[in-house]
Amino acid sequence: MNILVIDLTHGGVKIAVSLAKKGEKVYCYDIYNTLKDVDRRMLEVYNVRLIELKDLKEFKGDIKVIYPVHLPLTSEDISKNNENLNYTFITHHEAIAEILNGWGEDIDKIEITGVKGKTSCAFMLKEILIDENPLILSSLGSLIYEDKKEIILQKNISITPANIKETIDLANKLANPICDGKSKNQIYNSAIFESSLGVSGIGDVGLLTNIVEDYPIAQGRSSAGIAKRQVFRCGIVCCEKDSLDKYYKDISHENVNSFSFDDKSANLYVEDVEYCLDETKIHMVFNDVKTKSGKSVSGKMEIETFAPGKHHVMNVLGVAAAALSLNIDKDTITKGLKNYKGIPGRTNKKNMGNITVIEEINPGINTKAIEASINMLDDNENYIISIGGDYGITCEEIDEDAVAELINTLDKDIILTGEVGKSILNKLNRKVKFIKDYNSVYELAIKNSKNLLFIYRSDYRKLSKR
């Protein structure tokens, strides 16, 4: 069977080469014309041929088309180039599952998707699994932990499904520096993979954090909620209950564990919560949580961790559900979450000079996230609130009109910053301060002895500068 991999911008090269190494006859279509010379040479080495869709008219028999879930083409757009072919269509996620068939059967594997909270959940789970030397793909990079020490495998790596395979390959190269084609050593005993639009299905547990926004993809022909249905290919699914009820009622899956802030029909919910900007105490109840061993567990758990707002607590609930699903004991879960202090360059709290700074830095910041971050201050008047960001961070841009409408309703000291802040400034009907350089916002807060809530839609290229 011929294989056509579409989209070389979002991991297609890795998928194509991986399949070619298995002896498959592979072709590629570079739909966005972004192929780099080094990748072009890599394809040539493995006899992977670049084609246009019109070239399909020369093909005969069966063909498997591997496409990303956000592809701006329909199956009809592709098949019309040769209607005599016998087509099979699978996503990049599904292709990775096929490529990795049989991998990691002796370790715990978690795949994380959702609109918000993915990276935070990944690093909370890292704290819980730290003794198992976790291998991690996250939006902050490919990492591995050995004896609780972080080893960076690769920075500036996207969470496209192909990079699950890339992360595994990087870990194998680290353990086996002499490449003889045989994997002799394995450092990691667990794996945590973050993915943006669904999961591959190789996870023992698939964690769907939420669908707080069902934004359109594939030129409006699909959506985030539809793409993330792929999480139900995992053996056990942990899903925020509102999202489960709203988007996935039609799915039949034997091992679904739901979590909710206050819905007692969920498998895991909050009984009581005591918020604090340093460490929030969460009393949770869990009932009939399905686990990897095949048994169900019930009980109560008290968590103390960095979760200053309700949206952070929801992340904790998802992580707790995922950990319980892996038969991890309560003591290990509570100890791991107590060690979680936020993520530098993301959601974290720190002291700078004489002030406290809470940073909410995220490429997917939206109006709801901004509102939730402001609400966690609980009318504390000793805070400056700074809102801003960069453009071109993710496929979906921020709704500036909605953010402006929110700011218009706030009776708080607001500073706008960055490209996004400048654009929002022109949409307001109230006066707020604009500071172009976000570093100057920190300086102003320190000078005036005012604590700072810094909410920023980030460009990862600038993370190292903060």
Residue ranges of predicted features:
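Walker A (P-loop) phosphate-binding motif
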Residues: 97-141, 148
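Adenine nucleotide phosphate-binding catalytic loops in nucleotide-utilizing enzymes
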Residues: 5-8, 21, 28, 221-222, ...
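Short, charged/polar "capping" segments at the starts of alpha-helices
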Residues: 33-40, 58, 71-79, 144, ...
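Flexible active-site lid/hinge loop adjacent to a nucleotide/diphosphate
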Residues: 155-251
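Conserved substrate/cofactor phosphate-moiety recognition/catalytic segment
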Residues: 134-169
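Active-site regions of enzymes building and remodeling cell-envelope glycoconjugates
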Residues: 24, 39-52, 82-90, 149-155, ...
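Short, basic phosphate-binding NTP loop
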Residues: 1-111, 278, 439-445, 464
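ATP-dependent carboxylate-amine ligase
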Residues: 1-35, 44-45, 65, 130-131, ...
